[in-house]
Amino acid sequence: MVEEIGRTAEGDIIINVGPQHPATHGVLHLVITINGETIKKVEPHLGYIHRSIEKMCESLSYRQFIYVTSRMDYLSSHINNHACALCVERGLQVEIPARAQVIRVLMDELTRIASHELWWGAMAMDLGAFTPFFHAFRERESINDIMEETCGARLTMNYIVPGGVMQDIHPNFQTRVKNFITLYKSKVSEYEELVTGNIIFQNRMKGVGYLSADDAVSYGCTGPTARGSGVSCDIRKLYPYEIYAQLEFDEILETGSDSFARYIVRIKEMNQSIRIIEQLIDAIPAGDFQAKTKAVLKLPKGEFYQRVETARGEFGVYIVSEGGTTPYRIKFRSPGFSNLSALDHMARGSKLGDLVAMMGTLDLVIPDIDR
């Protein structure tokens, strides 16, 4: 998993980390130059699970390609599907029923919490704390049960279709969501007790992986990675889609610019997602859950772009249409690729043992980066 592969003329050691390593949470290969325990350079090598997803999508219909994106950032699969559907709907100029919009946003925020829960448990486990992982999965399983009851799947939901959602919510949906909110609020104090307020955890995180606001912008970082450096970049606030402009919630910003600041952003974001869900769960309007669209969709000739806020940052979908039933060109803008590009800058001068903490706060999902 970690091996020496050479030395530089200055005597620095070059080592491999991965591509099979538990800290990468996927197939990620890092070539690291170290002087003693001090990192001098981190060079990510990608391509181990490249699947030509963008090219694959160009041979699929506008209904089919949406679900391929579930296999990219699989922890934000619903939000990825949402972005694709919005981009297609922009081209079709379809008006989405109010009921479908509310359901979509509710599912987005549940997905965001589920993703952050997994990150929180894995982040703590990477630093040697095993107990929080089981606490995180307790809450996450409640969300997965809601997802399964609503659309039949627990991870890659494929619930969104152009024009709305695949089917209406389960009769128990609102009750199950309210029960989850009650559970989460009763357990969130444990997060502070187990991890956030733990002095050992703080010592491992504070001052580690510094990334200034200017550097975050230069590297194209988005999501909690950038907001931990004080950069305002929440797409739900800056470029509202669906009904986000009508909702009351805060964009979480921290100015610490280190691993602990990025950690705090994600913890507080879960509370904001709960706040959004509470505003909507008793306000789901009656009506259709899907607009009437043709079975075979044709986008007019042109270029269309849509961005959304996933659990990891800005996810963008760019479609070039020649007026046919399949895209002429599709390009995805994934948050993980830009966030990973900042790892070398963050790590230089740090100790090798701190690399795990830095990578953990980037919340990398490798299929999102290497697609």
Residue spans of the language-model regions?
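Active-site bordering "gate/hinge" segments
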Residues: 1-29, 33-329, 333-371
